[in-house]
């Protein structure tokens, strides 16, 4: 029994050490990616370069984050957490206390703000892998939140709308590649895009 307990204790210490090592590597990788982003922009991000700066094997980077999209989402994680907290418990109109339609408009406007601040990194997060925009947890949270608010707004107004479809339709213009196309090629201002998004709420 004593030897069994001793062996279990050794295994436990090894597992804790491995978890601590994995956490350190993750932090090193994220810090390295942030340094590259700050000094060279999103165009300088690659899995190989991040591994070089972090001084870890490129296989470690892939194991931790899967692809460049996963790494970009990790860099955006703190901002995304603050945004979700604001949706759930922040001040109105983004948080509770305003009408459902006002909250939807505020959410879309806040997403425009994020695109203005982080379009380069968001573009990497959304386009570095097929369907990356739609398979990340953040999109699912945004979609589910909009579905709930649309259902509430529809109940208030008596309008019959497909909440799941409309939620995707409202998020579609906020895909980073389309947003940048409208801003840089079509010359639309951020404020004009906000007004356009607000107009999509007419069915509610």
Language-model segments: which ranges?
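Hydrophobic/aromatic-rich alpha-helical bundle segments in the mid-to-C-terminal region
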Residues: 122-127, 132-136, 140-143, 151-200
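Amphipathic alpha-helical segments used for helix-helix packing
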Residues: 72, 109-133
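Basic, helix-initiating cap at the start of DNA-binding domains
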Residues: 1-53, 70-73
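Hydrophobic alpha-helical connector segments
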Residues: 74, 88-117, 167
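Short hydrophobic/aromatic patch on the recognition helix
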Residues: 55-65
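Amphipathic alpha-helical interaction segments
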Residues: 28, 49, 70, 102-110, ...
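Short, basic, alpha-helical segments at the C-terminal edge of helix-turn-helix-like DNA-binding modules
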Residues: 77-84
């Amino acid at each position: 029994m004593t030897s069994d307990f001793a062996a279990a204790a050794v295994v436990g210490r090894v597992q804790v050490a491995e978890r601590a090592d994995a956490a350190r590597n993750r932090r090193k990788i994220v810090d390295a990616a942030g340094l590259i982003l700050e000094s060279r922009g999103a165009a300088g991000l690659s899995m190989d370069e991040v591994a070089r700066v972090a001084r870890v094997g490129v296989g470690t980077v892939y194991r931790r984050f899967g692809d460049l999209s996963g790494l970009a989402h990790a860099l955006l994680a703190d901002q995304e957490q603050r945004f979700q907290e604001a949706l759930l418990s922040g001040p109105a109109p983004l948080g509770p206390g305003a009408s459902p339609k006002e909250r939807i408009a505020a959410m879309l406007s806040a997403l425009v703000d994020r695109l203005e601040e982080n379009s380069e990194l968001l573009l990497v997060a959304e386009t570095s892998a097929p369907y990356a925009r739609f398979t990340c947890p953040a999109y699912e949270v945004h979609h589910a939140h909009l579905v709930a608010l649309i259902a509430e707004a529809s109940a208030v107004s008596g309008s019959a709308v497909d909440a799941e479809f409309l939620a995707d339709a409202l998020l579609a213009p906020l895909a980073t590649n389309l947003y940048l196309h409208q801003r840089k090629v079509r010359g639309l201002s951020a404020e004009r895009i906000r007004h356009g998004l607000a107009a999509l709420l007419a069915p509610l």
